[in-house]
Amino acid sequence: MTPTHSIFRQTLIECKKIGDAYDYLPNGSANYPFLYTGEMINTDNSHSDMVGTMNQTVHLYGRLSDRKTLMEYESKLHDAFKRMRHAFGYNLSMTDYTTQLLQDNTDIQPLLHIVMDVSFMYTKGEQLNG
């Protein structure tokens, strides 16, 4: 399995521990709040799958009345990502983490949209210090 897919899968597993989570943007029948494991960027430092940096974006959507729940989800995910050390044969360390809280008016009702950008350093088959 590639490092990109490994980290994506582990990230989705962590999201599903917190709430309703998808690996695609669900249609309008999904209940709010929900999490969506989305875009990813892989910076391959060695031109192999041995070492690199992976940026994973996670989206949290909810109604305006879900603000407290969304903030709790974001906090729990931050802690879970910080603790993540392994993903399907790769060792991980979270190296960067940013969030944005956005107003989203694409639905009939106004929504809150949290965008979490998480960077992981990965190595294959060796333990990371830390």
PLM region descriptions:
Residues 65-72:
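Short, conserved charged micro-motifs
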Residues 29-30, 61, 96:
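Non-transmembrane, interaction-prone segments in cytosolic or luminal domains
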Residues 1-46, 72-79, 84-88, 129-130:
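Small/polar-rich, solvent-exposed N-terminal microdomains that initiate assembly or binding
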Residues 36, 59, 117:
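Conserved beta-strand segments that form the floor/walls of ligand-binding pockets within enzyme
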Residues 1-10, 40-53, 93-130:
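Short, charged interaction patches at domain edges and termini
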Residues 60-64, 120-122:
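Short beta-strand-to-loop capping motifs
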